[in-house]
């Protein structure tokens, strides 16, 4: 049998809930994604709580709450202690996302599910990988290799490939085949025939995706129209994910049009977010990387966007029309919720949603058709304690401090007794004479005598009072005192300034003291009141989610052509639609498990380990194929002297084989290649490529619905045997490796 693979959804199947899946490979348990929603519903984590202690490794795919939101809570409360793997941007931006969530919640509630320290603890030991980096696990995971690949949805977002004994398990959710301003498209189509593909059906029913140029024009025209009539524009956004694409669109448009309307990016960590993003250019699109290499122009040096970390700065901004991108996208908390309540009753204003709101949130309610004219909103804020409440609070705090001091003194006394009891050579403690005599009091009278408290008996171990003395011993060697090189390291001034400006340390972490500067730490309580908000402003939703549409999903799954397919994360209708399509056109083994339902997707193929004998390899001729080398081998299975299964040379002359062309030709790329060679080329009907006057190329083979390939493809050259025919054929052969 092949590698044993079982998949168990813990959250996020047959609905739009957060993503969390248990994948077991030969007994090694991966938790892939550990998401939560903006409602922080603990009931969603019950399946995870039952298996958290058995997890051996955690893989994170994207830096948003739906993929990483439950990680701090799971590590603090559920017993999750496995190592975590992610790309550098997912680690850094995910950390900032959780900071923003915590600070937003703490401002309006007594949020206690996790703290800043819990967030730091969860992220401090994340093992960071680069794209396509093969990381070999050890110990229980010996023989398993993991590697992140470009997903195209968010900065650093990953498709995970897990390999064991030559079989691939691909986890690909929330991917985007389209190239965007700051991201390249996914590389999912580069995988062929994996043993298992785990993917989502989120957009399986969405097929009318607008062209990027037209979408951007509608987006900018809608914003401009409301600004020009004196209205404000609110874009509820995530903390550090899809908002980056929106910032670039606005920045470039403002530069081209010369607009004077201010743009504000308002989150608790906006400055930190942009500072980190500036250093992640190698993770972005080719155009951004090339622009920086040639002109040193960083696309995220935002000249038209002002970064804010508190709403007071926005309130103090000059009056007039403005664009504000504020978190959270769900409108359940954060600055966006406050701004919506303030701006909703003005018909000149616009609330522009760029993604579908999470189920059960205010954003989802406002996106319904038709939108509501009134919404009931519970607004909460912290108010300082006063009067009797403040006195009671201070008394309680003083009582707690006294109890803590008493506990500390008792512990110290026990330690002192233990230290004296264990030191046989220690001198006897000096006894304090507690007798109060008239000579001591002297002429000061009874007033001084009353200072002494009756019943006070010094401990038997009391000693004469002394100033504390600490002996700081230093280590020496033959050359003198040993120095610590870390004491002389000069920190990067830019990082220091950035950290201080952003409210964190040089690693981007926030501590409780820094958080206290962002939050009012005076004694306070949460006051809540329900408001009926009149929704007179315009409500518009546009698709900037950065996900492939249904047609592209089907085409890519057909191209990948997995042996077994597992569908997750979509409503029931979309899941069943994609499942039936794949069963009919792509793969006979398609699974869509329920929560905590384990499906066994072990490969039906048998895998064996064999040794390549020296006799065989001495006659093999390799040919370069990208970063690898390939060769055709004729051999038979036998055993060497060490009784190991090996591939041995054939006893006689090997029979000739037909030439094999290795490679994957894209007709669009080949068209550009022929054009560079001076060949007149154009697309004809049915996807054919007309080359010159007489020759036509076309791909043929099994196809699925809407043209998606579902099997091996062939390339046909049609035309008379002429000079152009042979020239085009040679150009075609040059695109492959011949074995």
UniProtKB/Swiss-Prot annotation:
Disruption phenotype: Impaired antisense-RNA-mediated gene silencing. Early flowering. Gene3D superfamilies: Ribonuclease Z/Hydroxyacylglutathione hydrolase-like. One of its GO terms (biological process) is mRNA 3'-end processing by stem-loop binding and cleavage. The keyword Nucleus applies. CPSF plays a key role in pre-mRNA 3'-end formation, recognizing the AAUAAA signal sequence and interacting with poly(A)polymerase and other factors to bring about cleavage and poly(A) addition. Required for antisense-RNA-mediated gene silencing. Component of the CPSF complex, at least composed of CPSF160, CPSF100, CPSF73-I, CPSF73-II, CPSF30, FY and FIPS5. Forms a complex with cleavage and polyadenylation specificity factor (CPSF) subunits FY, PAPS2, CSTF50, CPSF30, CPSF73-I, CPSF73-II and CPSF160. Belongs to the metallo-beta-lactamase superfamily. RNA-metabolizing metallo-beta-lactamase-like family. CPSF2/YSH1 subfamily. This is Cleavage and polyadenylation specificity factor subunit 2. It comes from Arabidopsis thaliana (Mouse-ear cress). The gene is CPSF100.
């Amino acid at each position: 049998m092949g590698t044993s693979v079982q998949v168990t959804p813990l959250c996020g199947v047959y609905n739009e809930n957060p993503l969390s899946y248990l994948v077991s490979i030969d007994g090694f348990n991966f938790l892939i994604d550990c998401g939560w929603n903006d409602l922080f519903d603990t009931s969603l984590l019950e399946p995870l709580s039952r298996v958290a202690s058995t997890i051996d490794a955690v893989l994170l795919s994207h830096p948003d709450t739906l993929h990483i939101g439950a990680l701090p809570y799971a590590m603090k409360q559920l017993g999750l202690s496995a190592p975590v793997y992610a790309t550098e941007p997912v680690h850094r931006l995910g950390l900032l996302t959780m900071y923003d969530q915590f600070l937003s919640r703490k401002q309006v509630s007594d949020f206690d599910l996790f703290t800043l320290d819990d967030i730091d603890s969860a992220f401090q030991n994340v093992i960071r990988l680069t794209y396509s980096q093969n990381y070999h696990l050890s110990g229980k995971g010996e023989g398993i290799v993991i590697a992140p690949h470009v997903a195209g949805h968010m900065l650093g977002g990953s498709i995970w490939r897990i390999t064991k004994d030559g079989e691939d398990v691909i986890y690909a959710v929330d991917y985007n085949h389209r190239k965007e301003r700051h991201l390249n498209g996914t590389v999912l189509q580069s995988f062929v025939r994996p043993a298992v593909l785990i993917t989502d059906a989120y957009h399986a029913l969405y097929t009318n995706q607008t062209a990027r140029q037209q979408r951007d024009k509608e987006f900018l025209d809608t914003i401009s129209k409301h600004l020009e009539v004196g209205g404000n524009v609110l874009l509820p956004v995530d903390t550090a994910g899809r908002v980056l694409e929106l910032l670039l669109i606005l920045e470039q448009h403002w530069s081209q049009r010369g607009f004077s309307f201010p743009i504000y990016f308002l989150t608790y960590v906006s400055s930190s977010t942009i500072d980190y993003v500036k250093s992640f250019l190698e993770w972005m699109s080719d155009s951004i990387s090339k622009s920086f290499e040639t002109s040193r122009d960083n696309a995220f040096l935002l000249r038209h966007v002002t970064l804010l970390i508190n709403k007071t700065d926005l309130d103090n901004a000059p009056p007039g029309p403005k664009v504000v991108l504020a978190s959270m996208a769900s409108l359940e908390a954060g600055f966006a919720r406050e701004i919506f309540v303030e701006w909703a009753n003005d018909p000149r204003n616009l609330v522009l949603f760029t993604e579908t709101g999470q189920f059960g949130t205010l954003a989802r309610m406002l996106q319904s058709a038709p939108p509501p004219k009134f919404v009931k909103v519970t607004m909460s804020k912290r108010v300082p304690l006063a009067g009797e409440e403040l006195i009671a609070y201070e008394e309680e705090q003083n009582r707690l401090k006294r109890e803590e001091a008493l506990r500390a003194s008792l512990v110290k006394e026990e330690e002192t007794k233990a230290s004296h009891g264990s030191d046989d050579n220690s001198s006897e403690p000096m006894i304090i004479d507690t007798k109060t005599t008239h000579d001591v009091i002297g002429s000061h009278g009874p007033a001084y005598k009353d200072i002494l408290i009756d019943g006070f008996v010094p401990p038997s171990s009391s000693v004469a009072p002394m100033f504390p003395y600490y002996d700081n011993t230093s280590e020496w060697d033959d050359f003198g005192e040993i120095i610590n090189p870390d004491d002389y390291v000069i920190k990067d001034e830019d990082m220091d300034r950035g950290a201080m400006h952003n409210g964190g340390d040089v690693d981007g972490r926030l501590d409780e003291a820094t958080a206290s500067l962002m939050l009012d730490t005076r004694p306070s309580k949460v006051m809540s009141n329900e408001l009926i908000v009149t929704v007179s402003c315009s409500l518009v939703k546009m698709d900037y989610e950065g996900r492939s549409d249904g047609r592209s999903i089907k085409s890519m799954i057909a191209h990948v052509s997995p042996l077994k397919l597992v569908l997750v994360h979509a409503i029931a209708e979309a899941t069943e639609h994609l499942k039936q399509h794949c069963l009919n056109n792509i793969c006979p083994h398609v699974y869509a498990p329920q929560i905590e339902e384990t499906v066994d997707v072990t490969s039906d193929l048998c895998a064996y380990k064999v040794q390549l004998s020296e006799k065989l390899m001495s006659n093999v001729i390799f040919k370069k194929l990208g970063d690898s080398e390939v060769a055709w081998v004729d051999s038979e299975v036998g055993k060497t002297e060490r009784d190991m299964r090996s591939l041995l040379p054939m006893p006689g002359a090997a029979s000739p084989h037909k030439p094999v062309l290795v490679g994957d030709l894209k007709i669009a790329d080949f068209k550009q290649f022929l054009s560079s060679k001076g060949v007149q080329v154009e697309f004809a009907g049915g996807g054919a490529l007309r080359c010159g006057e007489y020759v036509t190329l076309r791909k043929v083979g099994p196809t699925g619905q809407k043209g998606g390939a579902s099997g091996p493809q062939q390339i046909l050259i049609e035309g008379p045997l002429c000079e152009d025919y042979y020239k085009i054929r040679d150009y075609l052969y040059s695109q492959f490796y011949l074995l």
